Amino acid sequence: MLVSYKWLKELVDVDVTTAELAEKMSTTGIEVEGVETPAEGLSKLVVGHIVSCEDVPDTHLHLCQVDTGDDELRQVVCGAPNVKTGINVIVAVPGARIADNYKIKKGKIRGMESLGMICSLQELGLSESIIPKEFSDGIQILPEGAIPGDSIFSYLDLDDEIIELSITPNRADALSMRGVAHEVAAIYGKKVHFEEKNLIEEAERAADKISVVIESDKVLSYSARIVKNVTVAPSPQWLQNKLMNAGIRPINNVVDVTNYVLLTYGQPMHAFDFDKFDGTTIVARNAENGEKLITLDGEERDLIADDLVIAVNDQPVALAGVMGGQSTEIGSSSKTVVLEAAVFNGTSIRKTSGRLNLRSESSSRFEKGINYDTVSEAMDFAAAMLQELAGGQVLSGQVTEGVLPTEPVEVSTTLGYVNTRLGTELTYTDIEEVFEKLGFAISGSEVKFTVLVPRRRWDIAIQADLVEEIARIYGYEKLPTTLPEAGATAGELTSMQRLRRRVRTVAEGAGLSEIITYALTTPEKAVQFSTQATNITELMWPMTVDRSALRQNVVSGMLDTIAYNVARKNSNLAVYEIGKVFEQTGNPKEDLPTEVETFTFALTGLVEEKDFQTKSKPVDFFYAKGIVEALFIKLKLDVTFVAQKGLASMHPGRTATILLDGKEIGFVGQVHPQTAKQYDIPETYVAEINLSTIESQMNQALIFEDITKYPSVSRDIALLLAESVSHHDIVSAIETSGVKRLTAIKLFDVYAGNNIAEGYKSMAYSLTFQNPNDNLTDEEVAKYMEKITKSLVEKVNAEIR
């Protein structure tokens, strides 16, 4: 929002520097982006009256004699196409500075002396987008009353100061000059004084000419007025100046009046050429799918049913709240004007303007909110201006459909509530002074008071909003600084937080790097690596298909990360994530999923790269399994690894499930080569472990056992076995032998080859025995070994070597 300081001072008596005002507004809730002066850097620019203008033969140049208030006429050579005798222009005399700090000097053009330069607004640094189209390709023509020799700054309001405000959505009331004036008046304790117009209506009724119908619940109110016998012409210079300083291009007096009212009241308006209507009934309705409309910018718009249009004779003539239609555009020959002032649903306008990429000053205000209280007043103000500036005759009455609430909103609170939240000791009198500055009526007492909030401040609805207003106007800098007095409770980590930290320590100690992947994925990937897939929880309105379902595993997202890195030549990767997966056992549309904390890692490439003295070492199953084992050693939990051939997307010969007390808590293994090919990644090993289940085990109390003073005894045993027998099978056979004093089983050798029959292998184990209360004898150990040997022979058909 660009605010003219000259214009602001017409609405409220404020006499401070713009720097001070900017600082004050920023500290009370409306951020000021900056302050600019259009005249900054410009100098020696005066009004010139062209006494004579002669064409230079065989050129586009003109030799002008210009009165600049000096004793003699000034000769200036000008190439502008619209220069002519009798007009007032902008003259940069020798020594003047124009845009880009360019200095004007005396010179000769085609042998003709030129004592200055006749300037366009572009040459003064004004943007092309705000310059009237009739002057966009030529020089600026000043009003007839301009006095030669006077500085041009006051004529064009270039000496104004423009304050740029950054308006947040909750303070859309400041998207108008009246709204800003109310804010400044409250800050400085001043009164606003707004211009009032005396509207004279004809006896002829507007309702006899047109009718209004609302056919959409997205249209809250629609009002129309008719002004006849208007003369379309350029606006007076003062109006053009105000619009240009606000960043709006002047068009003609009719369109400029609607834009002036937009800036003044924050009420978007539109003007139709009534003579171009094919009917007399104005209908505000939803568009039809496939309906088309050519807007004022000349673009044909394809409409959908969610768009709002203004239609006459079932033909759209405007895109409601966004832009008018070309078919009813105000032109130089327009005589009868229909003024529109309406309130449309902000969400609908935002969707339409966003879909069509068509943002406008009107759509911006409808999106953020409109002051219901001044819709009718703004309409009458615009009609009165057309009387003044276009000689129009206003037909009697507004034709209105829809009723808007205009009564103030009542919000109640207590003095104690205010002081508790601000840490102040304000009195009821202090509160009254604040709301008097804001222009809000207040009644009640220190026990409880009620504030009548005018409709212009639609952001205030609850007592917390009142507290904010009190703090803003009273002054944030006046609020006392105190330390919190509430008693503190010593905090501690939850069991899951402790577990996560211990897992993170092990993972990073193993050289893994933490990543965070998306919790949303495709429905297929959501269950791809799940050991027990549940119902899929899908979003009703996903942003993309790739992010439409809550994951039930982390591995699939981690493989996407692996693929992304491998595609960029980063092939040695070791990553992990501690995150949630979402299991849904109920109805996904009615029940929330269960969040399960998991630890997942992925390895690919080389553990060690080749150098002059060592060979490269690729990642394998045992390296991945070793990380898992290191984790459970750190957690002091005993787990069992069981070969798993049926896990989807995993290699059937290099995958194991992880059991804790007989319950499956995860898996570790190689991604199936076909799955790896789908992800376009090399050989990769992954593991996923359920931390939520582990947490419940971690909470069990530990029982202390005395450290025994008696030594342990070890025995080795070598077995000849079929290749199909796994390490787990052997350990299970040993553990089920019934030997109570067995404390450790360690595999220290595996061999297959020479002297071993085909289809067989040799495995050697070290078995440790210990009695915590006495020394073991050789006879006892021999009995234990006999039991173990018998169990191995019976259960896995082992041959003792």
Curated annotation (Swiss-Prot):
GO terms for cellular component: phenylalanine-tRNA ligase complex. Residues 708-801 form the FDX-ACB domain. Its EC number is 6.1.1.20. GO terms for molecular function: ATP binding; catalytic activity, acting on a protein; magnesium ion binding; phenylalanine-tRNA ligase activity; transferase activity; tRNA binding. It is an enzyme of class 6 (ligase). Binds 2 magnesium ions per tetramer. Residues 406-481 form the B5 domain. Mg(2+) binds at residues 459, 465, 468-469. It catalyses: tRNA(Phe) + L-phenylalanine + ATP = L-phenylalanyl-tRNA(Phe) + AMP + diphosphate + H(+). Signal peptide: none annotated. Keywords: Aminoacyl-tRNA synthetase, ATP-binding, Cytoplasm, Ligase, Magnesium, Metal-binding, Nucleotide-binding, Protein biosynthesis, RNA-binding, tRNA-binding. Belongs to the phenylalanyl-tRNA synthetase beta subunit family. Type 1 subfamily. HAMAP family: Phe_tRNA_synth_beta1 (MF_00283). Tetramer of two alpha and two beta subunits. This is Phenylalanine--tRNA ligase beta subunit.
